[in-house]
Regions:
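The alpha-helix within a helix-turn-helix
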Residues: 18, 29, 57
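Key DNA-contacting residues within the recognition helix of helix-turn-helix
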Residues: 36, 40-41, 50, 54
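ADP-ribose/NAD+-binding catalytic cleft of ART/PARP-like enzymes
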Residues: 50-104, 255, 265, 274-283
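Active-site and NAD+-binding cores of ADP-ribose-processing enzymes
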Residues: 139-283
Length: 283
Protein backbone atom coordinates (compact mmCIF):
# COMPACT_ATOMS: atom_id res chain seq x y z
CA UNK A 1 0.00 0.00 0.00
CA UNK A 2 1.14 3.55 -0.69
CA UNK A 3 -0.21 6.64 1.04
CA UNK A 4 -1.80 9.44 -0.97
CA UNK A 5 -1.48 12.80 0.78
CA UNK A 6 -2.55 15.16 -1.99
CA UNK A 7 -4.76 18.21 -1.51
CA UNK A 8 -6.31 20.61 -4.00
CA UNK A 9 -3.82 23.37 -4.83
CA UNK A 10 -6.45 26.07 -4.45
CA UNK A 11 -4.07 28.62 -2.91
CA UNK A 12 -1.81 28.49 -5.97
CA UNK A 13 -4.79 28.40 -8.33
CA UNK A 14 -6.28 31.52 -6.75
CA UNK A 15 -2.94 33.26 -7.22
CA UNK A 16 -2.98 32.30 -10.88
CA UNK A 17 -6.50 33.65 -11.44
CA UNK A 18 -5.68 36.92 -9.66
CA UNK A 19 -2.68 37.40 -11.92
CA UNK A 20 -4.37 36.25 -15.12
CA UNK A 21 -7.48 38.39 -14.56
CA UNK A 22 -5.44 41.31 -13.19
CA UNK A 23 -7.78 41.70 -10.25
CA UNK A 24 -7.36 41.97 -6.47
CA UNK A 25 -8.81 39.88 -3.65
CA UNK A 26 -11.85 42.11 -3.25
CA UNK A 27 -12.75 41.81 -6.92
CA UNK A 28 -12.30 38.04 -6.85
CA UNK A 29 -14.51 37.82 -3.78
CA UNK A 30 -17.25 39.75 -5.57
CA UNK A 31 -17.03 37.67 -8.74
CA UNK A 32 -16.94 34.26 -7.04
CA UNK A 33 -19.30 35.12 -4.15
CA UNK A 34 -16.60 33.93 -1.74
CA UNK A 35 -16.04 36.23 1.24
CA UNK A 36 -12.74 38.04 1.76
CA UNK A 37 -12.43 36.31 5.13
CA UNK A 38 -12.71 32.91 3.46
CA UNK A 39 -10.15 33.85 0.80
CA UNK A 40 -7.75 35.02 3.52
CA UNK A 41 -8.27 31.69 5.30
CA UNK A 42 -7.35 29.79 2.15
CA UNK A 43 -4.11 31.76 1.88
CA UNK A 44 -3.24 30.81 5.48
CA UNK A 45 -4.36 27.16 5.51
CA UNK A 46 -4.27 26.13 1.83
CA UNK A 47 -7.67 24.43 1.99
CA UNK A 48 -11.36 25.19 2.45
CA UNK A 49 -14.86 23.68 2.31
CA UNK A 50 -16.51 21.82 -0.56
CA UNK A 51 -18.88 24.66 -1.44
CA UNK A 52 -16.00 27.13 -1.70
CA UNK A 53 -13.98 24.81 -3.94
CA UNK A 54 -17.04 24.54 -6.17
CA UNK A 55 -17.57 28.31 -6.36
CA UNK A 56 -13.95 29.06 -7.20
CA UNK A 57 -13.30 26.31 -9.73
CA UNK A 58 -16.69 26.82 -11.39
CA UNK A 59 -15.87 30.51 -11.78
CA UNK A 60 -12.50 29.67 -13.33
CA UNK A 61 -13.94 27.06 -15.69
CA UNK A 62 -16.86 29.21 -16.82
CA UNK A 63 -14.38 31.99 -17.61
CA UNK A 64 -12.50 29.67 -19.99
CA UNK A 65 -9.64 28.73 -17.67
CA UNK A 66 -8.88 25.03 -18.16
CA UNK A 67 -6.66 24.76 -15.11
CA UNK A 68 -6.65 20.98 -14.79
CA UNK A 69 -5.98 20.27 -18.47
CA UNK A 70 -3.13 22.76 -18.60
CA UNK A 71 -1.64 21.33 -15.41
CA UNK A 72 -1.59 17.96 -17.16
CA UNK A 73 0.53 19.44 -19.96
CA UNK A 74 2.90 21.12 -17.53
CA UNK A 75 3.35 18.00 -15.40
CA UNK A 76 4.08 15.89 -18.47
CA UNK A 77 6.73 18.40 -19.51
CA UNK A 78 8.30 18.17 -16.06
CA UNK A 79 8.13 14.40 -15.57
CA UNK A 80 8.65 11.69 -18.15
CA UNK A 81 5.82 9.31 -17.23
CA UNK A 82 2.62 10.59 -15.63
CA UNK A 83 -0.62 8.65 -15.08
CA UNK A 84 -4.06 9.71 -13.82
CA UNK A 85 -6.68 8.07 -11.62
CA UNK A 86 -10.29 9.14 -11.12
CA UNK A 87 -11.72 8.57 -7.64
CA UNK A 88 -15.39 8.86 -6.72
CA UNK A 89 -14.78 9.78 -3.07
CA UNK A 90 -11.09 10.64 -2.77
CA UNK A 91 -7.98 8.64 -1.92
CA UNK A 92 -5.97 8.24 1.26
CA UNK A 93 -4.10 5.13 0.15
CA UNK A 94 -3.71 2.82 -2.83
CA UNK A 95 -3.51 -0.99 -2.94
CA UNK A 96 -3.48 -3.59 -5.71
CA UNK A 97 -6.54 -5.28 -4.22
CA UNK A 98 -8.84 -2.29 -3.90
CA UNK A 99 -10.76 -2.68 -7.16
CA UNK A 100 -13.58 -5.06 -7.95
CA UNK A 101 -12.61 -8.52 -9.19
CA UNK A 102 -14.80 -8.02 -12.26
CA UNK A 103 -12.93 -4.99 -13.58
CA UNK A 104 -11.30 -5.23 -17.03
CA UNK A 105 -8.26 -7.17 -15.82
CA UNK A 106 -9.36 -8.24 -12.36
CA UNK A 107 -7.99 -6.78 -9.16
CA UNK A 108 -5.47 -3.97 -9.49
CA UNK A 109 -5.08 -0.21 -9.34
CA UNK A 110 -6.37 1.34 -12.56
CA UNK A 111 -4.95 4.49 -14.13
CA UNK A 112 -5.17 6.25 -17.49
CA UNK A 113 -2.54 8.04 -19.53
CA UNK A 114 -4.47 11.34 -19.65
CA UNK A 115 -6.44 13.58 -17.32
CA UNK A 116 -9.46 13.35 -19.61
CA UNK A 117 -9.59 9.56 -19.32
CA UNK A 118 -9.70 9.71 -15.53
CA UNK A 119 -12.32 12.47 -15.60
CA UNK A 120 -14.55 10.45 -17.94
CA UNK A 121 -14.82 7.58 -15.46
CA UNK A 122 -15.96 9.72 -12.52
CA UNK A 123 -17.75 12.70 -14.08
CA UNK A 124 -21.14 11.42 -12.88
CA UNK A 125 -20.08 11.66 -9.23
CA UNK A 126 -20.42 14.95 -7.34
CA UNK A 127 -17.56 14.31 -4.91
CA UNK A 128 -15.14 12.85 -7.43
CA UNK A 129 -11.53 13.94 -7.93
CA UNK A 130 -8.66 13.14 -10.26
CA UNK A 131 -5.13 12.35 -9.06
CA UNK A 132 -1.85 12.40 -10.96
CA UNK A 133 1.04 10.01 -10.31
CA UNK A 134 4.58 9.63 -11.53
CA UNK A 135 5.35 6.10 -12.67
CA UNK A 136 8.56 4.31 -13.64
CA UNK A 137 7.99 1.03 -15.48
CA UNK A 138 11.59 -0.03 -16.06
CA UNK A 139 12.35 -3.55 -14.81
CA UNK A 140 8.68 -4.50 -14.48
CA UNK A 141 6.97 -7.39 -16.27
CA UNK A 142 4.47 -5.73 -18.57
CA UNK A 143 1.63 -7.38 -20.47
CA UNK A 144 0.53 -5.24 -23.41
CA UNK A 145 -2.64 -5.50 -25.46
CA UNK A 146 -3.80 -3.59 -28.49
CA UNK A 147 -7.38 -3.51 -29.81
CA UNK A 148 -7.33 -7.23 -30.56
CA UNK A 149 -9.21 -10.47 -30.03
CA UNK A 150 -6.94 -11.31 -27.07
CA UNK A 151 -7.76 -7.99 -25.41
CA UNK A 152 -11.48 -8.51 -25.93
CA UNK A 153 -11.39 -12.08 -24.60
CA UNK A 154 -9.43 -11.01 -21.51
CA UNK A 155 -11.94 -8.31 -20.61
CA UNK A 156 -14.91 -10.60 -21.25
CA UNK A 157 -13.30 -13.22 -18.99
CA UNK A 158 -12.66 -10.86 -16.07
CA UNK A 159 -16.06 -9.20 -16.41
CA UNK A 160 -17.67 -12.63 -16.26
CA UNK A 161 -19.43 -12.89 -19.61
CA UNK A 162 -17.57 -15.76 -21.29
CA UNK A 163 -19.52 -18.53 -19.57
CA UNK A 164 -18.38 -21.96 -20.79
CA UNK A 165 -15.76 -20.36 -23.03
CA UNK A 166 -13.85 -19.11 -20.00
CA UNK A 167 -12.15 -22.49 -19.62
CA UNK A 168 -10.84 -22.72 -23.20
CA UNK A 169 -7.09 -23.11 -23.64
CA UNK A 170 -6.88 -19.84 -25.56
CA UNK A 171 -8.54 -17.88 -22.77
CA UNK A 172 -6.60 -19.60 -19.99
CA UNK A 173 -3.32 -18.71 -21.72
CA UNK A 174 -4.32 -15.05 -21.93
CA UNK A 175 -5.41 -14.97 -18.28
CA UNK A 176 -2.16 -16.61 -17.19
CA UNK A 177 -0.17 -13.88 -18.94
CA UNK A 178 -2.21 -11.20 -17.19
CA UNK A 179 -1.84 -12.76 -13.74
CA UNK A 180 1.94 -13.15 -14.10
CA UNK A 181 2.45 -9.49 -14.99
CA UNK A 182 3.30 -6.52 -12.79
CA UNK A 183 1.46 -4.12 -15.08
CA UNK A 184 -1.13 -4.50 -17.81
CA UNK A 185 -1.19 -1.80 -20.50
CA UNK A 186 -4.22 -2.00 -22.76
CA UNK A 187 -6.93 0.08 -24.45
CA UNK A 188 -9.56 1.38 -22.05
CA UNK A 189 -12.97 -0.28 -22.22
CA UNK A 190 -15.85 1.65 -20.69
CA UNK A 191 -19.39 0.33 -20.29
CA UNK A 192 -20.40 1.41 -23.78
CA UNK A 193 -17.57 -0.63 -25.25
CA UNK A 194 -18.27 -3.56 -22.96
CA UNK A 195 -21.80 -3.72 -24.32
CA UNK A 196 -20.28 -4.50 -27.72
CA UNK A 197 -17.93 -7.06 -26.18
CA UNK A 198 -20.81 -8.77 -24.41
CA UNK A 199 -22.68 -9.02 -27.72
CA UNK A 200 -19.65 -10.84 -29.11
CA UNK A 201 -19.43 -13.11 -26.04
CA UNK A 202 -23.11 -13.99 -26.42
CA UNK A 203 -22.68 -14.86 -30.10
CA UNK A 204 -24.77 -11.96 -31.42
CA UNK A 205 -21.98 -10.37 -33.49
CA UNK A 206 -18.72 -11.70 -34.92
CA UNK A 207 -15.21 -10.74 -33.82
CA UNK A 208 -14.48 -8.52 -36.84
CA UNK A 209 -17.63 -6.46 -36.35
CA UNK A 210 -16.93 -6.10 -32.63
CA UNK A 211 -13.29 -5.05 -33.02
CA UNK A 212 -13.99 -2.55 -35.79
CA UNK A 213 -16.72 -1.01 -33.63
CA UNK A 214 -14.41 -0.84 -30.62
CA UNK A 215 -11.68 0.85 -32.63
CA UNK A 216 -13.91 3.94 -32.79
CA UNK A 217 -13.66 4.53 -29.04
CA UNK A 218 -10.28 6.29 -29.01
CA UNK A 219 -10.22 6.37 -25.21
CA UNK A 220 -6.50 5.71 -25.00
CA UNK A 221 -4.59 3.28 -22.80
CA UNK A 222 -5.15 2.13 -19.24
CA UNK A 223 -2.41 0.99 -16.88
CA UNK A 224 -3.39 -1.69 -14.38
CA UNK A 225 -1.01 -2.08 -11.45
CA UNK A 226 -1.13 -5.78 -10.53
CA UNK A 227 1.79 -6.24 -8.11
CA UNK A 228 3.29 -4.60 -5.03
CA UNK A 229 6.53 -4.17 -6.97
CA UNK A 230 4.74 -2.02 -9.54
CA UNK A 231 2.70 -0.19 -6.90
CA UNK A 232 5.88 1.01 -5.21
CA UNK A 233 6.83 2.80 -8.45
CA UNK A 234 3.88 5.19 -8.13
CA UNK A 235 4.53 8.64 -6.65
CA UNK A 236 1.45 10.85 -6.03
CA UNK A 237 1.72 14.36 -7.49
CA UNK A 238 -1.51 16.34 -7.22
CA UNK A 239 -5.26 16.19 -6.63
CA UNK A 240 -7.62 18.00 -9.04
CA UNK A 241 -11.05 19.41 -8.21
CA UNK A 242 -13.84 18.57 -10.66
CA UNK A 243 -16.39 21.37 -10.70
CA UNK A 244 -19.92 20.87 -11.98
CA UNK A 245 -19.47 22.74 -15.31
CA UNK A 246 -16.43 20.64 -16.19
CA UNK A 247 -18.19 17.39 -15.28
CA UNK A 248 -21.23 18.39 -17.34
CA UNK A 249 -19.03 19.15 -20.37
CA UNK A 250 -17.45 15.73 -19.98
CA UNK A 251 -20.85 14.02 -19.80
CA UNK A 252 -21.95 15.73 -23.01
CA UNK A 253 -18.81 14.63 -24.84
CA UNK A 254 -19.34 11.04 -23.68
CA UNK A 255 -22.89 11.09 -25.05
CA UNK A 256 -21.57 12.24 -28.43
CA UNK A 257 -18.91 9.54 -28.36
CA UNK A 258 -21.62 6.98 -27.64
CA UNK A 259 -23.44 8.03 -30.81
CA UNK A 260 -20.26 7.47 -32.80
CA UNK A 261 -19.79 3.98 -31.38
CA UNK A 262 -23.43 3.07 -32.05
CA UNK A 263 -23.09 4.21 -35.64
CA UNK A 264 -19.81 2.36 -36.09
CA UNK A 265 -21.39 -0.86 -34.77
CA UNK A 266 -24.29 -0.65 -37.23
CA UNK A 267 -21.91 -0.03 -40.13
CA UNK A 268 -19.55 -2.79 -38.99
CA UNK A 269 -22.39 -5.32 -38.85
CA UNK A 270 -23.09 -4.61 -42.52
CA UNK A 271 -19.44 -4.53 -43.60
CA UNK A 272 -18.10 -7.54 -41.69
CA UNK A 273 -20.78 -10.19 -42.02
CA UNK A 274 -18.35 -13.05 -42.66
CA UNK A 275 -16.18 -12.80 -39.54
CA UNK A 276 -15.78 -15.60 -37.02
CA UNK A 277 -18.16 -15.93 -34.07
CA UNK A 278 -17.04 -16.87 -30.57
CA UNK A 279 -18.13 -20.51 -30.88
CA UNK A 280 -15.95 -20.83 -33.99
CA UNK A 281 -12.92 -19.21 -32.36
CA UNK A 282 -13.07 -21.12 -29.07
CA UNK A 283 -14.43 -24.43 -30.33
Amino acid sequence: MIEVKCEYQIKEDIGFILEAERINDAELAERTKISRTTLDGIVKRGRTTGSVYEKFYSYAYENKYRINSVKEELIKEKYRDVLFHGSRNGLTGVTVSGSRANCDFGEGFYLGETYGQALAFVCENRKSSVYSFRFASSGLKIQRFDCSLEWMLAICYYRGTLGKYGQSSIVRKIVSQVEKSDVVIAPIADNKMFYIMSQFAEGEINADAALHSLSASKLGLQYVIKSEKALERLIPIEKYYLCLPEREDCRRSLIERGYEIDTKLKLAKREFRNGLYIEEILK
